[in-house]
Amino acid sequence: MKKKTSWPSIVIPCIIGLLSAGVYLFPFWIGVENRLYDFFLGLKSDVKEDSSIVLLDIDDVSIEKVGLYPWPRNTIAKGLEALTQLGAEFAVFDIEYIDKSPMSVDFTYLNGALKSEFAASFEEIGANVQDIFAALANNQITLPEAGIYGSELVDLIDQSRDTLYRHTKQVAIENDSYLGQAMRLFGSSFITVNMQDDPPSEGTEDLYAIAKERFVYPKLKVNAPLSDGRHSALVPIPEISRMAAGAGFTNVYIDSDGVRRRIRLTDNIGDTVFMQLAFSPLLKKLGAPEVVIDKNLVTLIGAVYDGKEENVSIPLDSSGMMLIRWPKKNYQNSFTHIPFYLLIDYAESGEKTASSLRLLRANQGWNLGPGYAPIDTCMQLWDESEELRRTALESGAVQDKEAWLTAVQTYWDTVKSFFETDYGTSVAHLFDEAKQAGNPEDAKLYDQVKADFGTLYANAATSYNRHTELETVLAGKLKDAFCIIGWSSTGTTDIGVNPFHSEYVNVGTHAAVANTILQRDFLQQAPVWVSALLAIAFSFGIIVVIRRFSTLVQIIAGVVLSVVVLIVNQLIFNVTGIYIFIISPVLALFVSFLTYSMVSFIISEREKSFLRKAFGTYLSGDVINEMIEDPSMLKLGGQKKWITAMFTDVKGFSTISQGFSMKKVSEL
C-alpha cells in the first residue's frame, strides 16, 4: 500500500519557509544578521597588513612636544618637507583645510637658526674689528693697510646686513601658501573633499570649479546609473586645492547599529564623480588603471601589483559599497604608526646642526691650524641647500626639487666627513700648544676660548647625531610609504566603531580601505534573495530528511543539520569571502524540524489514543501495541500468510485431546 503524504510535510515548510524568507523586511533582524556577520568575520583569519601603509599620528606625544592642536600650518608644511627628504611616496591628509589661517611667526626659526645667524654674523664682525685693532696695536699693519681692511670689513657688514634682513623676512609666514607649496613640492599630496547633502553655499562656485578641474579621476567609465548622490562639497581653500595632487571624500557609512562595516568608493554630485580619500591616491599607486563602475562591481583594468598589470574586481553590496576587511587588532596595534612630531624633530635637528655649526665657525680656534675652510664648506652647502629649497617651493618644478634633494644630501655627506675628522680633539690640542708657546698672560683667554670651542662642537655633534639617528629610524619606515595623516590624540572626537572594537580612531578607516584593495582580500555579501530561497529549500528539505524517523531522531537530526549549515556557511566565507545571510535559512530549518516534530508527535499520540479506545475492549494490550507500531494491520480481509508450525507436544497428545472439550484442552 502506497503511503500518503501527510499534510504537515506540505503546510509546515510552506508557512515557515515564507515567514523566514521575509525576516529581512524587519530592521531588527538586519541588525542581528550584522552582528552574526561580525562573529563570522572574527572567526576568519586576520587580514595581512601592507607594510607600505603608515599612519602619521598627531597623537598625545606629538601635541606635548609641538604644542596645542590645531597647529599652525607651517608646522605641517615642515613635516611634509621632512617626508620629502625621507622618500615617502604618498601623503594623505585626513585634515580639512576649508578656512584660511592667519599668518604666524616661525618661533623655531626665530629662536634657533636666525638667532644663531645674528650671533655668528656679529661675532665675525667683532672678531674682524678686534683683529684689525690688535694688528695696529702690535704694528703688524700700517694705517693705509688698516684702511683697506676697514673697507673689506664694511663690505662684510653690508653683506651680513642684507643676508640677515632677507632671512628675517622668513620669520613671518603666510601659512596657507607655505603648506600648499610644500604639498606641491612633495608631489603626491591628497586632501579632503567633504560631500554635502545641502545645496551649495553662495560664493563657492570657484572652489567647486577647482575640484572638478583637479580632483576628478580621468580614466573613469560608468556602466550603471549613478545614484542621486550629493548636492555640494566642502572644498579646501585655493592656496591648498590648487597645489595638492588630488583629493577624495571622507564621508563614511554607518550601519543602523552604529558600526562601520562598509565604505562607498565613489560618490557623485550630478554626473561629476569623486573618489574616496584612500581610493584616490591608491589609484595612482596602482599605476592609474581604468576604473569601470557597474551596479555591484568596481573593476580596475590594468592595475599594477608587484610590477604586473592585472584586472581587479572589487565587489560591492546592494547599496554600492565595499565591505571593509578590518584588521582584528586595535588602532594602535594595526599598521605602522609614527608620531608626527618625529618629522618636526627631524627637521629641527637639521636646523640646529646648521645653527650650531654657524656658532662654532665664529670661534677663533680655527685660526690655530685647520683654518676656516672645513666649516666654511659646510655652511656654504647649507646656505645653498636652503636657497634651493626656497626655489623649489616657489616653482614646484621637479628639477628644482631634485636639485634641492641633491644639495641636501651633499651637505649632510660633508657634515659627516667634518665630524669624522674629529676637530673637537685636534683643535683642542692646538689650543694647548698655542697656550704653551704664547704669552702666559693669555693663558686664561686660551682656556676660555678652548672651552667655548668644546661646548659648541659638542652641541653641533649632538644635533647631528640626533638627526642621523632619526633619519635611520624614519627612512626605514617611510621610504615609498603610503602615509595617512590625522588627529588621533585623546582629544579627538573622530572615533568610531568597527566589527572588532568599540573605539577605533577613524583615521584608521582609510588605512583599512587601502589595505583591503592592496591585499585584494575582498568580502562580499550574497543577495538577500539567496537567503530567502535557501530558507524555503531548507524548510522542505529538512522535513524530507527527518519525516521517516522517530521524534527523538528528528530532534537530533534537526539540531545537527542546523549546526552543519552554520559551519558550511563559515567555510564558504573563509574560502571565498562570500557571506550568506544565514539567520533566515537556519531559522527556517530549525523551526521547520521543531514544528514538524511537535505536530507529528501530537498527531501520533492522538492516533494511539484512538486505537486504544477503539480496540481496548476486545483486544489485548499487546495486540493494540502491535497495531500502533504497524497501523497497516488495521484493514479488512485479514492477512494471508504461509506459516510453518513445529509441534513438540507429548506423544499421543493429539489423540488424547480429541476426547476433551475445548475448555478442558485450554485448562491442560
Residue ranges of predicted features:
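Regulatory cytosolic signal-relay segments
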Residues: 584-641, 655-659, 664-667
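Non-transmembrane alpha-helical coiled-coil
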Residues: 433-473, 479, 490-493
